[in-house]
A protein has these predicted regions:
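Active-site-adjacent core segments of small-molecule enzymes
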Residues: 1-338
Length: 338
């Protein structure tokens, strides 16, 4: 299956999981249906979000691993976005357990490092085709409102790694605040040092704030926009901080399989601290017009041969271009609180 086909199908899958498509959608019309069904001006996934700005304080600890200037000791402007996992920009914050961070770092040499992180440390399947198969297998049957058990079992037989993901997500604590969430990059990247040496890495944003866990009952009763109201309240009291933690792969660790976490005892390097200072509504915030395509990396950081990573560039491009057209016609609106 070609990357372009996978990319288009993934956009469709994101939309389907958000409940935005009817049963008449076909492979020929999915892009047109996408543009019609998504609220104009919103991102095609993680439609509900809020912009933030701050500073990334690089401590120089990773400079020996990569020639990228983002790892030299310096203070770098940061623009980012917090969001929830639903594709619906008007969704309640308790409608999904997924919370996310997107980030753009812009060092003085005019290079850029863009990244997208979620609060789950690995991808459900080993490739993009598996993700599509998962969406099909778990699509509710009209007569029961539940997935067909036979299709689910067939999917899990072909993609057994997904069972681990499903079980872990069922046990994952429900976060009550962006401020204490740890965010992970599930794909591997390659750091290239000035001498040419290469080091595969994944990374996370590890919070300084305490993780706030909610019971299911607390989350079910929470305010429609509780996460976004909370982040505003937290920042009114002062900046929030996350460590950028690089996890270094060793020989034999799966670099091209985002469904397989690396052993927890792998060496870690704290490359710097992200300081988040302010948030602004996404309708007019600095993050609105940014494409947080994680394949846009500076010299010194390279893409691995992870097939999911390869598919993501086209996904982000299609979503971004459609969104900019809509914004250009004045159709962008603010989701939070509406």
């Amino acid at each position: 299956m070609g990357i372009a086909v996978i990319a288009g199908s993934l956009i469709l899958a994101f939309a389907w999981t958000a409940g935005l498509f009817g049963h008449q959608t076909t492979s020929k019309t999915f892009l047109g249906d996408t543009l019609k069904n998504f609220d104009p001006g919103y991102r095609r996934a993680h439609g509900k979000g809020i912009c933030f700005d701050g500073t990334y304080h690089s401590n120089g600890a990773a400079a020996a691993l990569s020639k990228a200037t983002v790892f030299a000791k310096s203070d770098i402007p940061a623009i980012g976005r917090f969001s929830i996992g639903s594709g619906n920009p008007h969704a309640a914050d308790n409608s999904t357990a997924t919370v996310s961070m997107a980030l753009l770092l812009s060092p003085a040499d005019h290079s850029q490092w863009r990244m997208k992180l979620n609060n789950f440390p690995y991808f459900p399947t080993r490739n993009a085709e598996g993700f599509l198969a998962q969406q099909k297998a778990f699509k509710p049957v009209p007569s029961t409102g539940k997935p067909d058990p036979a299709l689910v079992e067939a999917f899990l037989k072909e993609y057994p790694e997904a069972r681990k993901s499903i079980e872990q997500k069922a046990k994952m604590p429900l976060t009550g605040s962006f401020s204490g969430a740890e965010f992970y990059v599930v794909n591997a990247f390659i750091l290239r040092a000035a001498n040419g040496q290469q080091q595969p890495v994944r990374w996370s944003m590890r919070p300084h704030s305490k993780f706030i866990s909610l019971t299911k009952e607390q989350r079910d009763q929470a305010d429609h926009d509780f996460l976004f109201k909370d982040i505003k309240k937290c920042l009114a009291e002062g900046p929030l901080y996350w460590d950028l933690v690089l996890q270094l792969a060793e020989l034999g660790d799966p670099v091209n399989d985002p469904s397989q976490p690396w052993p927890k005892d792998r060496k870690e390097v704290i490359a710097g601290i992200l300081e988040v200072k302010n948030v602004t509504d996404q309708v007019n915030g600095a993050c609105r017009d940014i494409n947080f395509d994680p394949t846009l990396v500076p010299p010194g950081i390279e893409l691995s041969d992870d097939p999911v990573l390869a598919a993501r560039a086209a996904i982000y491009s299609q979503s971004y271009n459609a969104r900019l057209r809509e914004i250009g016609f004045g159709k962008a609106t603010d989701a939070v609180g509406k």
